[in-house]
């Protein structure tokens, strides 16, 4: 398949290689020493697209996905971090929704922090999945007007989004666990991790454990729509979660820090890095109650994100431009104040906020 994970023969462009072995002898040893360590290590050379790293190395490249409208070859930015010692493989991807940049921010902060000589196993990273949406700051892939996280496991002969999904899913299938970094688009949302395989899935407990290890403080444990990576990958035996890193226009430093800490928790707990992880108790919701505007105007919220909600609590009110109250909305259920729209102006029936329901602790 043309867009499959491959070696360097399919190079798309002259992507700069990270060459720590040749540029930093103190850290990685001489070329001869590195070749010797490769021969002695049980860890193999690892490639993803045009990126290829020996044990103790990092490399970046491109994962082919076809051609653009002017016939230029197109690819996703990828990185391979290949540890000195054998171990598990972690797959990480970001920006399958093109306007969700916090995951890209996590990758940008995380990769320079990781020393492959101190790592057991391999990390495969796709830094930007929806490259077409990313380039124009759109949520969906503008080539086929598709939400990328509804296209998995993909089709190598299908639409643009299906081909991208197929190329990345082939990499996912090489992993022992996977993180699909998201956020609540440009709305306001708490930090949470999503378990999307469904409570009856044979990997549910493994996915929930991974979500608890990431430790955002909140978990949404609810079967997701068809086509989500966190639904498709568990069907192949790979525990996978969607960390949802708040919601922002652009990059949010607090959410990025939360994401980096979450990935480091996973790397430590699953044996990629030395150390111990102690996770706190987390709030889990298994459903949502959404609220729309009963009238047009401007919304004022009565609660902060993460607040506990009791049935009958006033959640928001709608006023006109002169401050006159037109409508008030109270909670129908108990739960957690989970997500809100970012802009205050609303039309009748327009989405305003969500309350996480059926709440317990895990």
Model-derived segments and spans:
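Structured catalytic-domain cores with a bias toward divalent-metal coordination
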Residues: 2, 10, 14-15, 20, ...
